[in-house]
Amino acid sequence: MLYYSGPVARLVDEFAKLPGIGPKTAQRLAFHVLNSPPELAQGLAKALVEVRQSIKRCSLCCNLTDEDPCSICQDTTRNSNLLCVVEEPRDVIAMEKARGYRGYYHVLHGAISPMEGIRPEDLTIKELLHRLQNGDIQEVILAANSDVEGETTALYLARLLKPLGVKVTRIAHGIPVGSDLEYADAMTLNKALEGRGEFG
């Protein structure tokens, strides 16, 4: 039974579609928007539309950006021999905040997960292989999460990349098993990078 009008119910439903937002939090957010000055709702709506219109994938690393190539790919002070492969754009943010890595990135936009119907061809693996063709990259660091999907993805990539003659390493497991990179602190991330080893 609905206790509020159609537009409010729709707003609650839309908030509830976001990850980590349950029905009660969605309701709380909706009523916060309703009880705030109109500028809050207008600013939120404008930001949502703007981000959907202006953000795209970098043609080199597949990270989300408003310019192509992205600022990281344009940075010539980075080590062009290193490529760190991560699952999501938020993992790039975590790595950059840790300030321990100065190579380039490749964002897969997910991990292989048969249970969720995510196959290798659903990820940006084709773009990764294309990137490795120029021969500049000497080491690929697999920084997929240390959960089942991340390990599956890392093993798949290691088997795919080994024949290309590139060194394939996996970040060390200072990252707790089953956790996501974005939640790791800077020191843990840096130690995991330093302790990486050959993989596959």
From Swiss-Prot:
Zinc finger (C4-type): 58-73
Pfam family, one: RecR_C
GO biological process per UniProt: DNA recombination; DNA repair
Ranges for domain Toprim: 81-176
Record carries keyword Zinc-finger: yes
Source organism, top-level taxon: Bacteria
Cysteines joined through disulfide linkages: none
Keywords: DNA damage, DNA recombination, DNA repair, Metal-binding, Zinc, Zinc-finger
Task of the protein: May play a role in DNA repair. It seems to be involved in an RecBC-independent recombinational process of DNA repair. It may act with RecF and RecO.
HAMAP family: RecR (MF_00017)
Family from the record: Belongs to the RecR family.
Family annotation (NCBIfam families): recR
Protein name per Swiss-Prot or TrEMBL: Recombination protein RecR
Species this protein is from: Desulforamulus reducens (strain ATCC BAA-1160 / DSM 100696 / MI-1)
Gene name per UniProt: recR
